Amino acid sequence: MRLPGAMPALALKGELLLLSLLLLLEPQISQGLVVTPPGPELVLNVSSTFVLTCSGSAPVVWERMSQEPPQEMAKAQDGTFSSVLTLTNLTGLDTGEYFCTHNDSRGLETDERKRLYIFVPDPTVGFLPNDAEELFIFLTEITEITIPCRVTDPQLVVTLHEKKGDVALPVPYDHQRGFSGIFEDRSYICKTTIGDREVDSDAYYVYRLQVSSINVSVNAVQTVVRQGENITLMCIVIGNEVVNFEWTYPRKESGRLVEPVTDFLLDMPYHIRSILHIPSAELEDSGTYTCNVTESVNDHQDEKAINITVVESGYVRLLGEVGTLQFAELHRSRTLQVVFEAYPPPTVLWFKDNRTLGDSSAGEIALSTRNVSETRYVSELTLVRVKVAEAGHYTMRAFHEDAEVQLSFQLQINVPVRVLELSESHPDSGEQTVRCRGRGMPQPNIIWSACRDLKRCPRELPPTLLGNSSEEESQLETNVTYWEEEQEFEVVSTLRLQHVDRPLSVRCTLRNAVGQDTQEVIVVPHSLPFKVVVISAILALVVLTIISLIILIMLWQKKPRYEIRWKVIESVSSDGHEYIYVDPMQLPYDSTWELPRDQLVLGRTLGSGAFGQVVEATAHGLSHSQATMKVAVKMLKSTARSSEKQALMSELKIMSHLGPHLNVVNLLGACTKGGPIYIITEYCRYGDLVDYLHRNKHTFLQHHSDKRRPPSAELYSNALPVGLPLPSHVSLTGESDGGYMDMSKDESVDYVPMLDMKGDVKYADIESSNYMAPYDNYVPSAPERTCRATLINESPVLSYMDLVGFSYQVANGMEFLASKNCVHRDLAARNVLICEGKLVKICDFGLARDIMRDSNYISKGSTFLPLKWMAPESIFNSLYTTLSDVWSFGILLWEIFTLGGTPYPELPMNEQFYNAIKRGYRMAQPAHASDEIYEIMQKCWEEKFEIRPPFSQLVLLLERLLGEGYKKKYQQVDEEFLRSDHPAILRSQARLPGFHGLRSPLDTSSVLYTAVQPNEGDNDYIIPLPDPKPEVADEGPLEGSPSLASSTLNEVNTSSTISCDSPLEPQDEPEPEPQLELQVEPEPELEQLPDSGCPAPRAEAEDSFL
């Protein structure tokens, strides 16, 4: 009910008098409480004054929020007690519960209470304030709770919302209590409208506590402490959020309390720790320390105890017994062990013959002391490959400031017995004497035995022991000597035999506790000549020599010979099952490629293999626009056979036959007259693709791990991202040159000896390329400078688009080789070189690599094959086609998008690998490869090679994944290459003067499918393999490929020059990179590279550098 609010003072005073009079006159009817006005709910006006009266048969009192506000208590004459509570100047904060209860318990029900709820609508107070405890509601199970957002006006409409939501929740509301229901672990607020103003309550947090069975663990920093040191114990509870710790300890029983500290382990959820720290421990603090943990919700409890020992001072005590005499066997490792207890941790020293031992004896002595428990230690002295000189008196001493103990023993070195001499002599007395001399430690015993039937002895007939017996007519004489320096015994025994009438096998056996040794000698009668023994020995040596020569000849014949991997297909049989390859020696060689030797200045060795080497050189007069040009020169070693010289000449003819292409290491010239054959090619200073990916992996990972990278970061930016350090191209070995590796450690790494020269070749210490410098720090020398238009990408950061670009460029180069009917047969990332501006070139690096020591090449018969990169038909049927190169291209893609990983890392190179390939096993998607890239890999790895996509289709598939900026830049570089006076372009134009303009796309219908013609020359080039037309997968309309432009020559020749080594300058046309979710995989092992001028290719190819 609503009562009038403010009343005049006189009226209030009169009312109080009247009320008191009524109370005095009213008879005592019951002992119950009477509240005036009766309630149970009142609505009062703000700023008004109101009186509440409570009466009863015992003293009564008004309570408000568990407190007794100021009130007037009285007792009437009839024994009735009353309490008057006057509320003045009411505000909204006076809203709430008021209780009237008895003030004592004189036989009355102590729990009898009268409740009255008063509302004071106050526009300035929307919601009643709550204590901090009321804002956090904790639950241990799913149950109904109340969110106490109470208002001062019962007429207000109140709604409940999640803290970050606008939708009202359908929960019943009580103006006196709040919202009641089952709530989730969320944050909630209440809203109401007062006038035209929306009012929000404080946020209420509902939180469900983790309550489970208590699991307590107690540990101490040290269970043994000295008097005066600190005792620190930790009690940890797992699986609960609110628990109570109670410690019991010896000091507590004597009334000396220690306040423990409780904290939460933030890095381990639901882990609470209580720490008991007792400073300056006394002897009385020894005893049991117990941690009792209780949880009040489910009344769970658990306790653990630990014993603490306080000692007056430290101690060292030996455990167990160690004999005073120890043994060690010569040349065997021996570990001497001493176990002891100590506190505090002691210092341990070992002595030999009163000299301190250490770990500095070249690895022959190892000392170690380890702590096996808190106070238990094991000290070990390990003698590695024991020597006689290590015998002696040893002492172990353990000590600290409070105590000391030592243990001594004698070490005896046991030496296995060995027969040093067994000889026979014929004294003049007619008897025959056999003398046996041997040594060992401990003292050896000597046993003589003999066997008369040489054919059946000793396997069928046991030897007869000899001694002082009349039957054998033999006598023994034995002398024993101890050698102090060697610390071993020497035994000399002489056996005297009488009347030896036929050959006799005499055996001398020495035996001691370590082992035994035996030698035999044939004692022959005096009449038998000793020349028989000498002749037998000579014949045996002759036989061994002949067998050794045969083995060496067989090994020499099986030694792999250098052969070029690239093959050019001439024709295919009508049934498509036989291929005839072009005999490279029948190809013409144009003298246009010839370069005078005096225009070539050779420098340091870049790479060296089993058959040849590649050196850095400076060529003069190759280009009109450049007086000098840095080049790579391939040559054979002086030990090369004629077949290998023929193979190198065949490689030269194939390269000149193929012609130039932007993504192939191009032939620049050759020296074939007046000395060894030199093949001069382009010089790629950043080395092979595998090494490049390894050295720049950190820039890729940093670049893509930053999720906050601004979208304005672009593909062709010349600046590093903010906060990204300059790339640190780490060299993996001591020396490196130009990105090429010296594959033979015993070869010279300085300068190439000019063999068979006429004196017309110049030598120079060519300045090594600074391959370790980042892109933006590299300043090329004059011969290397080129225009900025020839750079595809200048960014020093390795990006995802770079990986796609590398794949695209390799596909372009392989498309060119396929158009020339050329099969690569060793396509891998190690045979792809990186030039300036992230331009890649396909090569064959076998000449400068020792394939017999390269783990990527597996011996199969008399050759070494890169099995992990080979297609199934190549492995099992020796079938090589351009479509088997497509399989290898898929493996190369996997290498690129694993940042230089080794294929099939989970498969050993044994029968398991072959079985997995036969079953159709394929590698999983690399972490950095998109689904589109992995789909291309899977197409390349089709079991049936007929349905693998040709390289022309792979170019189009990869082109779709590139940005327009990249494609335009690549086309610009390609066109610039064709218009330049690059030596490969000029010499090809001179060789084909009538060939101008762009070549039309390859018409595969007229290539490779002619009838087989008889070939009397080289049957070695015929490999039976089917190579029908590939079935092109059904793809959508594809854009034209720009790669064909690189396979043609343009008659327009400008003054610009293309070089693989070029300075880097900013570019204007950026391309945004795709967003990647980067997953870092374990980094594969990197091979070591020699330090040189530029990154070295990995030693992983079989054949030619080109």
UniProtKB/Swiss-Prot annotation:
Its EC number is 2.7.10.1. Residues 33-120, 129-210, 214-309, 331-403, 416-524 form the Ig-like C2-type domain. The record marks 527-528 as: Breakpoint for insertion to form PDE4DIP-PDGFRB fusion protein. GO terms for molecular function: ATP binding; enzyme binding; GTPase activator activity; phospholipase C activator activity; platelet activating factor receptor activity; platelet-derived growth factor beta-receptor activity; platelet-derived growth factor binding; platelet-derived growth factor receptor activity. Changing residue 579 to F: Loss of kinase activity. Strongly reduces interaction with SRC family kinases. No effect on interaction with GRB10. Changing residue 581 to F: Loss of kinase activity. No effect on interaction with GRB10. The record marks 558-559 as: Breakpoint for translocation to form the CEP85L-PDGFRB fusion protein. The chain crosses the membrane at residues 533-553. Changing residue 771 to F: Loss of interaction with GRB10. Abolishes interaction with RASA1. No effect on phosphatidylinositol 3-kinase activity. The record marks 527-528 as: Breakpoint for translocation to form TRIP11-PDGFRB. InterPro entries: Ig-like_dom, Ig-like_dom_sf, Ig-like_fold, Ig_sub, Ig_sub2, Immunoglobulin_dom, Kinase-like_dom_sf, PGFRB. It is an enzyme of class 2 (transferase). Residues 1019-1106 are annotated as: Disordered. Autophosphorylated on tyrosine residues upon ligand binding. Autophosphorylation occurs in trans, i.e. one subunit of the dimeric receptor phosphorylates tyrosine residues on the other subunit. Phosphorylation at Tyr-579, and to a lesser degree, at Tyr-581, is important for interaction with SRC family kinases. Phosphorylation at Tyr-740 and Tyr-751 is important for interaction with PIK3R1. Phosphorylation at Tyr-751 is important for interaction with NCK1. Phosphorylation at Tyr-771 and Tyr-857 is important for interaction with RASA1/GAP. N-glycosylated. ATP binds at residues 606-614, 634. The modification Phosphotyrosine is found at residues 562, 579, 581, 686, 716, 740, 751, 763, 771, 775, 778, 857, 934, 970, 1009, 1021. It is a single-pass type I membrane protein. GO terms for cellular component: apical plasma membrane; cytoplasm; cytoplasmic vesicle; focal adhesion; Golgi apparatus; intracellular membrane-bounded organelle; lysosomal lumen; membrane. Changing residue 665 to A: In PENTT; gain of function in protein tyrosine kinase activity; shows ligand-independent constitutive signaling. It is linked to A chromosomal aberration involving PDGFRB is found in a form of chronic myelomonocytic leukemia (CMML). Translocation t(5;12)(q33;p13) with EVT6/TEL. It is characterized by abnormal clonal myeloid proliferation and by progression to acute myelogenous leukemia (AML). Myeloproliferative disorder chronic with eosinophilia: A hematologic disorder characterized by malignant eosinophils proliferation. Tyrosine-protein kinase that acts as a cell-surface receptor for homodimeric PDGFB and PDGFD and for heterodimers formed by PDGFA and PDGFB, and plays an essential role in the regulation of embryonic development, cell proliferation, survival, differentiation, chemotaxis and migration. Plays an essential role in blood vessel development by promoting proliferation, migration and recruitment of pericytes and smooth muscle cells to endothelial cells. Plays a role in the migration of vascular smooth muscle cells and the formation of neointima at vascular injury sites. This is Platelet-derived growth factor receptor beta.
